[in-house]
Amino acid sequence: MSVRVAIAGVSGRMGRALLEAVAADDGCALYAALDRPGSSLVGQDAGAAWGAANGVTVTDQAQAALKGAQVLVDFTRPEATFGYLEACALDGVPVVIGTTGFDEAGRARIAAAAERVPVVFAPNMSVGVNLLMKLAEVAAEVLQDGYDIEIIEAHHRHKVDAPSGTALGLGQAVARASGRDLEACAVYGREGVTGERDPRTIGFATVRGGDIVGDHTLLFAGVGERVELTHKASSRATFAQGALRAAKWVQGRAPGLYDMRDVLGLK
């Protein structure tokens, strides 16, 4: 039996990737296609713009469209996510959130919604990236304070938030594993005369350009050696496939806040 999937943000890059992934996945079926009010796709066939009509009409009426859906997959922007979350909570529809750029208050709103419906919330749905997160924790536990930690990420010119949600997730992972508070020790870029590096800090560097899908490198720099863990995404399909894996996994789960480590059994 296929999972009835609603997709939010079908006009975006990830929206297209999700439409294509659902069409190729025998375990999922497109049930609803949502986009922002005023979108040129509203009223059109969800797949027509990509040359693959699927019989599902794009709508901006979330509450009506979600009735009967078994999961909503959301890759939009924070302000849109909150509206979709509320609609899902009212109808008991599980949610998979791949949107990034949330502040602390936004993450608290997601956690509150997860008390009513199951929510899988992850900055990156890629199986490879989530394995990288696990490897990052192991490396931080083993290497400890003898190694300086730097996180370098690169994305396409259209990405609006920095550092990426994945980079911040890596920062959280190594901070937890090494007994640090990321908010207190993060350094977001350096300029001018900075003085010597504080060994307890975790540095972030951001690159934006071209059509880079997503590159992340975690660097542990010691004296006489360095360890680098790198993941490079060459297609958004990897994120879409991971999101659909989460959409299937969340079926029948109790309300709660989950992440891809739960989905992949990495906890």
From Swiss-Prot:
Q: Which domain of life is it from?
A: Bacteria
Recorded GO CC terms: cytosol
Catalyses which reaction(s)? (S)-2,3,4,5-tetrahydrodipicolinate + NAD(+) + H2O = (2S,4S)-4-hydroxy-2,3,4,5-tetrahydrodipicolinate + NADH + H(+); (S)-2,3,4,5-tetrahydrodipicolinate + NADP(+) + H2O = (2S,4S)-4-hydroxy-2,3,4,5-tetrahydrodipicolinate + NADPH + H(+)
**Which residues catalyse the reaction?**
H155 (proton donor/acceptor), K159 (proton donor)
Question: Any idea of its EC number?
Answer: 1.17.1.8
Q: Which UniProt keywords apply?
A: Amino-acid biosynthesis, Cytoplasm, Diaminopimelate biosynthesis, Lysine biosynthesis, NAD, NADP, Oxidoreductase
Instruction: Identify the PROSITE patterns for this entry.
Output: DAPB
Q: In which pathway does it act?
A: Amino-acid biosynthesis; L-lysine biosynthesis via DAP pathway; (S)-tetrahydrodipicolinate from L-aspartate: step 4/4
InterPro entries the record matches: DapB_C, DapB_N, DapB_N_CS, DHDPR_bac, NAD(P)-bd_dom_sf
Q: Which residues bind (S)-2,3,4,5-tetrahydrodipicolinate?
A: H156, G165, T166
Residues the entry annotates as binding NADP(+): R36
Residues that, per the record, bind NAD(+): G9, V10, S11, G12, R13, M14, D35, G98, T99, T100, A122, P123, N124, M125
Q: Which GO terms describe its molecular function?
A: 4-hydroxy-tetrahydrodipicolinate reductase; NAD binding; NADP binding; oxidoreductase activity, acting on CH or CH2 groups, NAD or NADP as acceptor
PANTHER family (alphabetical): 4-HYDROXY-TETRAHYDRODIPICOLINATE REDUCTASE 1, CHLOROPLASTIC-RELATED, DIHYDRODIPICOLINATE REDUCTASE
Q: What does it do?
A: Catalyzes the conversion of 4-hydroxy-tetrahydrodipicolinate (HTPA) to tetrahydrodipicolinate.
Q: Which family does it belong to?
A: Belongs to the DapB family.
State the name under which the record lists this protein: 4-hydroxy-tetrahydrodipicolinate reductase
Which organism is the protein's source?
Thiobacillus denitrificans (strain ATCC 25259 / T1)
